[in-house]
């Protein structure tokens, strides 16, 4: 019960700030998990309903995490954008794996000077019978295709160029490299 009262107070404060022309901001400094994504989507959906079209800044410092949960958060950010919100995404610290994909979700993508981006092939852990694992491989291939689509659409690189860079390794980029390749629009 106390959690609901606290959440209600936070919602009221967010509404008060939004009416004053403030940008709504959310810091996602966590692993991408069902719980962390659920909390973030709850906030974003609340903002979308209460103040359609309001400006939003999302700051990411994430080592990545669960692929499908990351895509759910990416889609929630796209709903905000389609609803007229101007969404700025910022990378600070480390935006790795799915964290790098989430950074791509904004209208404007900013990276802090000392931040790091890490991009790699989609990875997952599965166990089971051979036929089940083969089904999972098909799913991983689809998820990897989606990640490549997002990264190539938001950068100056083609799918093939990205695949060649990340094949069988983690690909680390400093902020100036990320800017040069179009993974961000600005470095601060």
What residues fall within each predicted segment?
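N-terminal organellar transit peptides
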Residues: 1-188
